[in-house]
A protein has these predicted regions:
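Non-catalytic, hydrophobic alpha-helical segments
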Residues: 240-244, 258, 269, 307, ...
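NAD(P)-dependent short-chain dehydrogenase/reductase
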Residues: 147-149, 161, 171-248, 262-263, ...
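Residue-level signal for the nucleotide or nucleotide-sugar donor/cofactor binding architecture
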Residues: 68, 104, 112, 160, ...
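C-terminal amphipathic/interface module of NAD(P)-dependent oxidoreductases
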Residues: 299-348
Length: 348
């Protein structure tokens, strides 16, 4: 019998990545999406044709859900239960995920990143209390550290509406896990920066690798960035999604910090990307103050010791240089009009 997993945020990087992972394990995956003029069911399903061919017992379904509306959440969960009888695992990955944009619509960030968690957990308490739930929190909760690394016991200091919304969502997880009248199996993961070829070009790492590829092909003349005085702890998203799944396989729910524990400054990102194409980045990178984020978080580094001990998390399964190279290679092939394959990092 297939395990049944519901994943919110069908267009997002982690939702696509986790769907690949779960289909490879023979899951029945139900992706939720918000009905709008930009949604293309065929465009979503095309990513998973090979997974479904390789795993004939796996299934993929789509379900409408507006996570910012409680009635829509309830209708979605009840519809899934009616059609598929149960929900074994729920992954709350949908979010208003661009930190800079969250300053322009603070209320939406709180609604989608925080209150949506309440909507789902309250619905599960009343309709599917045995469902195990994972919520994607964020390293932006940290607010940055001048030195050292962040673990599960450190204090939060959210500096953006995005992070404040995620903080609210995480508190709802703790409340419903520990509440006498619910006692749900629910947890959150604080995944530090992670990316793969599904990362949007609105994010720094993909903007850097994609623009470097375009410059190498003569399709762009420069890369505009706000600045490079920031440091992040970057891992490949496939490994982070595996950690999400492992959290829900534990006997008791627990929150985890996930990351490589390595510091990489902005200059390292551009240096590695442009070096892949044998280009001097200083000739092409321009700085524009209008691209700087308000309340910029300078340094975000993880201490994943708990994940190592309890989830079998392995730090630095691929090097930072390999990470950047894989994205650069993919972007070069993509911008060359080829049909590049998604890297199978588990085989590296």
């Amino acid at each position: 019998m297939n395990n049944i997993a519901v994943i919110t945020g069908s267009n997002g990087m982690d939702a696509k990545t986790l769907t690949h992972f779960l289909l490879s394990k023979g899951y029945k995956v139900i992706l939720t999406y918000r009905r709008n003029s930009f949604f293309d069911e065929g465009n979503i399903k095309k990513h998973f044709i090979k997974d479904l061919m390789d795993n004939p017992n796996a299934e993929l379904h789509l379900e409408v859900c507006d996570i910012s509306c409680q009635n829509s959440v309830v209708e979605c969960i009840k519809s899934i239960l009616k059609r598929h009888s149960r929900i074994d695992e729920l992954y709350l990955l949908a979010a208003n995920s661009h930190v800079g944009e969250s300053f322009k619509n603070k209320e939406l960030s709180i609604q989608t990143n925080g209150m949506s968690v309440y909507y789902f957990l309250e619905c599960l308490k009343n309709n599917s209390p045995k469902t195990k739930t994972y919520f994607a929190a964020t390293s932006e909760l940290v607010g940055g550290t001048e030195s050292g690394a962040f673990n599960e016991n450190d204090k939060w200091n959210p500096k953006s509406p995005y992070a404040i919304g995620k903080a609210l969502g995480a508190r709802w997880i703790d409340f419903y896990r520990n509440s006498i009248d619910s006692n749900l199996f629910c947890c959150y993961g604080i995944l530090f920066n992670h990316s793969n070829i599904y990362r949007s070009k609105d994010f720094a790492i993909r903007k850097i690798t994609n623009t470097a590829a375009k410059i190498a092909l003569g399709k762009e003349k420069e890369l505009k960035l706000g600045h490079l005085e920031w440091a992040r702890d970057e891992h490949w998203s496939d490994f982070g999604c595996e950690a999400m799944w492992k959290m829900l396989q534990l006997k008791s729910p627990e929150n985890f910090v996930v990351g490589n524990g390595e510091t990489h400054w902005g200059e390292e990102y551009v240096e590695n990307a442009f070096s892949f194409f044998n280009i001097n980045w200083r000739d092409y990178v321009k700085f524009d103050d209008s691209l700087k984020r308000p309340n910029e978080v300078v340094r975000l580094i993880a201490d994943p010791i708990n994940a190592k001990e309890k989830l079998g998390w392995i730090q630095n399964r691929i090097s930072f240089k390999t990470h950047i190279n894989l994205m650069c290679k993919y972007d070069y092939e993509l911008e060359s009009g080829m049909n590049p394959e998604r890297p199978n990092v588990f085989s590296l």
